[in-house]
Design a protein with these regions (language model features):
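N-terminal regions that are enriched for targeting/export leaders
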Residues: 1-32
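Active-site-adjacent pocket scaffolds in enzyme catalytic domains
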Residues: 25, 40, 45-72, 125-224, ...
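C-terminal domain-boundary segment and adjacent tail
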Residues: 33, 213, 217-284
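Active-site beta-loop-alpha junctions enriched in small/polar residues
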Residues: 10, 37-39, 87-89, 153, ...
């Protein structure tokens, strides 16, 4: 099985200490893929300090030189991977930036090149803010040769004219009807690939994530834990789950102790040959 971690919202306001505290120990065992906002707009995102929220001012990543230097060093050492997380993330006129916003082709192109030039590393994956994207957003990332760090679906932009859309849709339908949990493989849509993020958040269930993890293990598939550095200390709403960080640590402990698990970056997993769905149920 391939295991990876996706962390969202690194931006101008993020400090190296925050990320080091969150992932200093974890990256001794495998990389963490950071979804980075290139030009953070201070809107409603909780990764933005409360005193700045609602000002709608724009803060380019390069203006936090301490963070940029720390990221460059961490990426060069293989501790982290840079992924593109929207452009501004928050848009005063558009609830979901990449569900139907303006100039999406330009934003994807400019945002990618900005991060690559700034951090000295390739960007292979796009993670839309709020995991929400539309048809134009998917076209934009496909044109740039990027993959999607979540799953979209027919209603969120998969081309109705592509045979791969319907073969993937049918495969997923059969998987779910047979009792399958999560999506333990990479989806290949032809012009781009997608990897499901398994949420590790205050509202997620450790029991459910462990079931998805077990299913991916049985299939020799993929498991991507998706979280936010800024909420690792927040308690989970489900009993016996502890904090978000504790839930993540439980999954990490399993991944690092099992010799059958290959811990890779999101970009490495999604860029490799896609894992095809297997017939039948995932045994409980």
């Amino acid at each position: 099985m391939h295991f990876c971690i996706r962390d969202d919202d690194t931006n101008f306001f993020t400090t190296p200490d925050e990320l080091e505290h969150a992932y200093g120990e974890i990256t001794k065992f495998g990389p963490v893929s950071l979804a980075i906002i290139p030009f953070c707009r201070a809107g409603t995102n909780k990764a933005v300090p409360e005193k700045w929220r609602g000002r709608w001012s724009v803060h380019p990543l390069h203006e936090n030189q301490a963070l940029v230097s720390w990221l460059r060093a961490g990426i060069a050492k293989g501790r982290f991977e840079a992924m593109l997380h929207g452009y501004h993330h928050d848009d005063e006129q558009q609830e979901w930036e990449f569900a139907g916003g303006k100039d999406l082709f330009q934003k994807v192109s400019d945002g990618r090149r900005y991060l690559e030039d700034l951090l000295g590393a390739p960007v292979r994956v796009f993670v839309p803010p709020h995991n929400t994207i539309g048809r134009q957003g998917l076209k934009a990332i496909a044109r740039e040769g990027l993959h999607l760090g979540c799953t979209a679906g027919v209603r969120s932009g998969w081309s109705p004219l592509s045979p791969m859309t319907w073969s993937t849709w049918l495969r997923l339908r059969k998987w779910r009807s047979s009792g399958g949990v999560g999506i333990p493989w990479v989806l290949d849509l032809g012009d781009h690939r997608e990897i499901a993020g398994n949420p590790v958040t205050p509202s997620s269930s450790l029991q459910e994530n462990e079931a998805r993890y077990e299913c991916a293990m049985q299939m020799g598939g993929v498991f991507c834990a998706a979280t936010h550095y800024w909420e690792l200390n927040v308690p989970c709403i489900h009993s016996n789950s502890g904090t978000v960080g504790r839930q993540l640590q439980s999954l990490v402990a399993r991944a690092k102790s099992d010799p059958q698990v290959m811990w890779r970056s999101v970009g490495d997993v999604i860029s490799a040959e896609p894992f095809l769905a297997q017939e039948g149920e995932c045994a409980p």
